[in-house]
Amino acid sequence: MYQIVGKRGSGKTTKCFERARKQGAIVLCTNKRAMRVTADELGYQDIEIVELADMKDTARDQKVVVDEALYVFKNWLEKAFSVKVDAISFTEN
């Protein structure tokens, strides 16, 4: 799995759009309206953008690029299981 890592404002979202275009992938995010505006401003009108609720209609073999994966995961856990995520851990490259 390819990883895009960087600080806030370092171009991670742009790299997600680039990766999605190159791989023929969709972009999964927490707010598709805001992401659509960003994509359009950056010239990525061809990229499909979805939220978790849209994933049930996505083809099983569809490639997905996840923007801000920790927030997407947190939102999924909190909505699906009515929990409040307090902390997470992850392994750095």
Where does each model-flagged region fall?
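Conserved P-loop
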Residues: 1-58
